[in-house]
């Protein structure tokens, strides 16, 4: 009978063959899933996967990419967010200063409710 701490399924069961020919069970902590993008749910590149203890001891460059929203959003979603923020700020300024030029392919944002 395994010890009570091993009876839960929070540990992975790994079957090992010993040199004597017996098969024994080793209990290992499960590896967490890869970090996902907060917007689209895709797997984040350049972000380490591991338990909190492993992440705590890892160097900063392995934990997340060195860019805005690195480790939270994938590059495509971060690019979209930054562009949307810039566009929103432009139209906010345009409302305050109507003399700013508007290019023909630009459309004003939808009014917020």
From Swiss-Prot:
InterPro entries documented for this protein: Ribosomal_eL34 (IPR008195), Ribosomal_eL34_C_sf (IPR038562), Ribosomal_eL34_CS (IPR018065), Ribosomal_L34e_arc-type (IPR047868)
GO MF annotation list: structural constituent of ribosome
One Gene Ontology term, aspect cellular component: ribonucleoprotein complex
Protein's GO biological process: translation
Pfam family for this entry, one: Ribosomal_L34e
Keyword Disulfide bond: no
Keywords for the protein's UniProt record, in alphabetical order: Ribonucleoprotein, Ribosomal protein
Protein family according to the UniProt entry: Belongs to the eukaryotic ribosomal protein eL34 family.
Official protein name in the record: Large ribosomal subunit protein eL34
